[in-house]
């Protein structure tokens, strides 16, 4: 658990010096801080002060003032010399930079025990970075597509002296020392690298925050003709297929658009996903296989019973674009996402790889449906129209025989062969490739 340091001061003299306390969670959600079993604490005298700080430091020599009565004064040297990490991009480094302090009050318990209560306050200050929202207004002449609102605009801090922590889509945080500040800048780019920003996060009051709104955190409207071959980045940004990508954009590309608009044969309902409405804006295919070569191959699921994804898609592929809907039915048959697994038929391995494993390797944009196992109609369309999306600036890994989410019989599910074209069906215990798609 988390660790903090405790001081007990009697008559201006430190009686207990930097005692390590470790947090344990209680059933009611509260937290109890306990010393190790060998450490016995005695207190409760009228002339005692109790001070706590977090996170624990092994070297506290010369960093406290035993004559002080308030935590700000007691820990003044610790606070002034505290150096928040330059790289706070992970939660661990962000939390380790957030110095907190407290003084304690005592409550007498049974059998002569004494409980200490602390209310922690932040000794540092917080810079909050808000990114703009980009609204893609689609200009397609042949299909009407509603605006695509990307609230998760990501910043690229690759070359920044200071690296903030992404607390939520489009929002970042950085811990700053209010006593001595920083002379370094937070610099970044967004909008696929086309826009830049910079600021120095100096905040003078402890336990306070300042919001930095990049370009006013405004809503930026952007005209875009959505077409197969467009690039969908990890933050939900779209880049047209005719634009030249930077190396950073290539690395951030998670999927390629293969269809613009909501297909009329898609009976999926998307309001509970990141899309937030019934109909999607388009569909995109993952850059990489869900099961890497050469170990590729997963069972579809349980033989001898339908999960409800059979359709006319085998003979009429264009009528079945229900990949997301079918994937949810398979998940229900497994007993929930947590019951999917890679090894047993009851765990529906193909769906596990499409939904769980691929998400672990390549996070879907926040404003999307999330990854799912495509239906036969979606896989058929991908194959038939591969020249429109397959040969762009980002290399796509897709070759071989792939499962779809569409059933054929109770024992069989439909596959699509990329390379030498072939649409077929096999028993669900057979092992084939898995390639994820998403709607956005």
Task: Locate predicted features.
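Short, low-hydrophobicity acidic/polar segments
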Residues: 1-126, 130-134, 178, 210-214
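Solvent-exposed serine/threonine-rich low-complexity stretches and specific carbohydrate-binding patches
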Residues: 14-30, 151-167, 199-202
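Residues within well-ordered beta-strands of beta-sheet-rich folds
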Residues: 51-53, 126-130, 175, 284-286, ...
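Short, compositionally biased
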Residues: 189, 204-206, 210-367, 428-439
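Accessory, usually C-terminal, subdomains that scaffold auxiliary metal cofactors
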Residues: 159-209
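Short helix-loop boundary/capping segments
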Residues: 101-174, 182
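C-terminal, surface-exposed recognition/capping segments
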Residues: 369-370, 376-440
């Amino acid at each position: 658990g988390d660790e903090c340091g405790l001081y007990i001061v009697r008559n201006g003299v430190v009686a207990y010096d930097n005692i390590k306390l470790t947090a344990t969670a209680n059933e009611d959600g509260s937290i109890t801080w306990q010393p190790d079993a060998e450490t016995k604490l005695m207190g409760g005298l009228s002339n005692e002060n109790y001070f706590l700080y977090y996170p624990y430091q092994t070297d506290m020599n010369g960093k406290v003032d035993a004559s002080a009565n308030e935590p700000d004064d007691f820990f003044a040297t610790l606070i002034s010399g505290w150096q928040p990490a330059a790289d706070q991009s992970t939660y661990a480094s962000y939390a380790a930079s957030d110095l907190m302090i407290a003084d304690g009050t005592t409550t007498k318990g049974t059998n002569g025990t004494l409980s200490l209560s602390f209310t922690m306050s932040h000794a540092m200050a917080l810079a909050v970075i808000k990114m703009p929202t980009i609204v893609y207004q689609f200009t397609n002449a042949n299909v009407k597509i509603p605006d695509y609102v990307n609230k998760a605009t990501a910043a690229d801090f690759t070359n920044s002296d200071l690296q903030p922590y992404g607390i939520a889509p489009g929002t970042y945080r950085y811990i700053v020392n209010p006593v001595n500040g920083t002379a370094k800048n937070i610099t970044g780019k967004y909008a696929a690298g086309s826009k830049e920003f910079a600021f120095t996060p100096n905040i003078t009051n402890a336990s306070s925050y300042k919001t930095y709104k990049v370009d006013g955190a405004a809503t930026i409207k952007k005209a875009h003709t959505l077409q197969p071959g467009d690039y969908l980045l990890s933050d939900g940004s779209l880049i047209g297929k005719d634009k030249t990508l930077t190396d950073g954009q290539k690395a951030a590309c998670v999927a390629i658009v293969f269809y613009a608009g909501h297909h009329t044969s898609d009976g999926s309902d998307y309001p509970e996903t990141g899309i937030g409405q019934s109909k999607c804006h388009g569909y995109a295919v993952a850059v990489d296989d869900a099961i890497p070569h050469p170990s590729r191959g997963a069972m579809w699921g349980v033989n001898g019973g339908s999960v409800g994804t059979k359709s006319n898609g085998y003979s009429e592929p264009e009528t079945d674009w229900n990949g997301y809907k079918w994937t949810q039915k398979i998940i229900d048959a497994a007993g929930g996402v947590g019951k999917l697994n890679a090894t047993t038929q009851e765990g529906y391995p193909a769906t596990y790889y499409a939904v769980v494993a691929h998400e672990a390797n390549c996070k879907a944009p926040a404003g999307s449906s999330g990854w799912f196992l495509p239906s036969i109609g979606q896989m058929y369309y991908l194959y038939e129209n591969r020249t429109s999306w397959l040969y762009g600036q980002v290399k796509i890994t897709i070759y071989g025989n792939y499962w779809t989410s569409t059933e054929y019989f109770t024992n069989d599910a439909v596959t699509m062969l990329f390379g030498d074209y072939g649409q077929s069906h096999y028993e669900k215990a057979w092992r084939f490739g898995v390639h994820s798609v998403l709607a956005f």
